């Protein structure tokens, strides 16, 4: 019944996309090699730099592996000329002073000094300060003005002594030692100054209480005995913090490019119209992007491991796997997210590379300047690029100094654990946001979904059953199933089709009314019908009028329906609903006996679409292109090749089946578009402007191909060429402002809406300027009107009641006396009918 095929094909969408993508990548070998070579070149540069640095500075290893003698560590014998600072805030009189000339008093007078002839002074001596604040200000000022040449004990103090308490009776001294720790301001270790200061004060107090200067106290500072192993500094890992972020993220702009390219070239739209599910599109795109990323990871990690870079061969291998796996997933979903904002590949590519370069440098500044000794705030990890770059930098730095973290170190307090966690969260969140934005953002082709589209299934569950019944459409294979259009939040601007927004109903043409009554009353043979449209309506939110308004239309087997209308009249919206791109606001349609509201999956198996412009992957061959769409339609694998070859023969492309699409001529590409529409035993084909941009010679050839196609199929043809519609169509349907205005054969419409006949008369060349046939014509028919005249050629419009045979005899009888060279008769053209029907269409006006 309905002419539907008994074959129930199961769509092989994953298989179709897998082989298409795999073949496309195989053809893009150069591009793939470049994608892999860029990170590989960066790693090779890292290897070269590593060898060069090691050759310049030699082995960066200490003499380890032996028992260190603790008593030889930080020994102090003597220091060069210098001075010490003393602070006596409590004004303890017994502290005294010690000057560079050897004079002194109190406790400090017993400090042992050494005379330096070169300076003509004794060392060490004390410079007193009244408070710690004054001393600090002085030291900071000296450091601010210090140069490399002045960094010595001659300008900066050896140490500072802060005296807190001195009790002579109890023989107790409480003091604090302050020594220089910053290496740029000192040529000796910090411990050496501490030992010197302690020795000096111990000797001083002993001499003070013993009453003489003969006592010398010496002590050393040392560690306990230990085995010191060789500490390897991995230059490659240290530098990897800058190289690896570039190497492992340079592929992201290409991910963005590939998605935007398929949107820009309408490849995704065509695939969706041919039955591809958007979820399957994203899933397979995800899989192939991750496959490319995996190949790059294998090369980068493999080369790095061969040369023993610590970041990949030491530490926790499982943690590194989790880290790289998290980055791959988050990078792909982040590229999905970014792709939703672009319509052109050029802008997408420039932005992608710019973002990678900026993010790497921004992370370097923030990680090593702002967050060097602290953890960044949580929002820092919400940008996958920054999170990955910081993690890679930290691992590279730690592994570079032989401190690669083991698995036991990955607690929540360890920042790398947080980075890995947030990368997985980023992957999920950006995927959901990308899928949402892809549906709701404005697009170049098609209409975006309502921002709350995801609530439709929930609202449908709570829809009142009585409202469901009010929209029930019985008949066909729908079996009386109810259809309910979601209202309230999502379609608050929906309208009442019956009263047409309160406007006065326009009186329908009798042919349109007859078509409508035939469909409503089921006065047709279902076996002869391939498409039945029943009250189909589409009203976009925010627009005052529906794009398609209560449309009733039928298409028979073997019929070519010329579906005409001005731009914006509703043609594309109607076809988009029939092919499943849009859902109707109300009404329905049956395609091959299947309801577009419920059975779109099966409908896609029996329909084909040839869009206005040739839409192909240029690097696929004719066979590979058709195999992709054949698999989308669900043709069994054992029949794929046979089906494709049969279609290629039907459109005369079998001899060039292995030729790449980019090598085909314009006419061949157009025929390949028809072949795409025929895949999967399509019984209904939609042709959108089939001969646009084609030469007149190729156009005639394409028309012959279309006439051959209609033998076993129904075709719905949209075109702006009235000649094309006149030649190809079995019937013409003209739509204006969303409503069907007229329907019938070409001759019927010309006779019904035409203004009569058109007659063109040419005057003999010698008499062009002296003879005008207008007076002769008006004598025959006073109602005749001159519509055009140029260079001896005159065109007249005659009323419908004109007897053409009488006019012909009249012109023959006056041919010689009025010097008439030739004349021709024509009925009102289809273009005249179209312009007359569409005269009130505001899309034209």
Swiss-Prot record:
Residues 531-762 form the ABC transporter domain. Pfam families: ABC2_membrane_3 (PF12698), ABC_tran (PF00005). SUPFAM superfamilies: P-loop containing nucleoside triphosphate hydrolases (SSF52540). GO terms for molecular function: ABC-type transporter activity; ATP binding; ATP hydrolysis activity; ATPase-coupled transmembrane transporter activity; lipid transporter activity. The chain crosses the membrane at residues 33-53, 192-212, 235-255, 292-312, 318-338, 347-367, 417-437. SMART domains: AAA (SM00382). InterPro entries: AAA+_ATPase (IPR003593), ABC2_TM (IPR013525), ABC_transporter-like_ATP-bd (IPR003439), ABC_transporter-like_CS (IPR017871), ABCA (IPR026082), P-loop_NTPase (IPR027417). This is ABC transporter A family member 9. It comes from Dictyostelium discoideum.
